[in-house]
């Protein structure tokens, strides 16, 4: 099956609302004729509403950087999938390496979030990747395989077709080391074989 490329921009905890609007207006002007790839922007939550108003009239899709595994309720600081849908969010990043590392998000939690995303008809972008010590000790496939198995647990075949897997070579982020295209392709091939 042919796959259309997806380019997703995670703005992380950068960009004020005004800066987000400047950036998305620039993107819509510069990328208006691009049809070969699906483009997704994932601004900070504070800018979702304003960015949504702009991208709804374009081919750029709106994504969120995270979401709760829970529905609406007493979950301070969280955001439910149904809330994201109000802004026409179509994608959500789950299991990003920073959330796994700093918020101690487990594969089990990522799986719960993926199920919640699918229930709301939001496409999860599930991130997997290994640290430098795993890469250097030859554990890449073990680590990535474990993350895949746990993060995708219980998803149906149909849900799997609507789930995007993103490989993050965590070992190459801020270390001065660079992941070569060949190294990334090796992991992509492993992921596809799972």
Q: What feature does the model see in each segment?
A:
Residues 1-194:
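Active-site loop-to-helix "anion-binding N-cap" substructures in soluble metabolic enzymes
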